[in-house]
Amino acid sequence: MRELRPGLWHWNAPHPQWEPTEPWDQNVSSYAIDDGERLLLFDPLSVPPEIEQLAADRETAIVLTAPWHERDTQPLVERLGFPVFTPLPESAEVLIQKYGITAEQAGDGSPDLAWLVREKKGEARLYSPGDRLPFGADVFPGREPEDTVLWIESHRAVVAGDTLVDFGEGLMIPSEWLREAVTREQVVEGLRPLLELPVEHVLATHGGPFDRAALERALSPEEPKVDPASRAT
């Protein structure tokens, strides 16, 4: 674990469901932000003991960039009772519309966070693009409505799930993860307002922290030649 700036931590952990065929690295990133009163855990996996100790003295919440990034959310909620801020998982209707599957295949909708959202085994605080969350975060649209990008004003940080990633070549919008109906240009258009903000840190949960220059390249009109050297140190 390392502290990127006062009150902002980053750590890596191996994802238990990773397969060698995945384009992303086995080690994924999680983050914690502390403002002195509230502690936020972003897409948490293998939370370090020091962060758990700090959580005992703070109003702590888990923040998921996407429902499928729950990682260690369920055991943390079961053990410590943290509320969970998350986009709403895909309903059956959304799955049918997106992927052209049958109602039978769609079932009750996405199984992501079913224990939290459908079975009510925790406190879910659902959010959508365009929302401003109570801890001062603005929600921007990602490559899907359920895959968000967050602007944390207090720490001048952008947190991204699967919309801004690093597969070993620097920060980028992953074209292989875009549905046929979604273009890179559409994603860039939704995120371009971030460039008007005083962004200093880009916290990718696949790849680690980057700087503002990496964000500018990732959101350039033309798909950029990425630069791994832009990784934050």
What residue ranges belong to the model's regions?
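Metallo-beta-lactamase
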Residues: 2, 6-9, 13-16, 38-41, ...
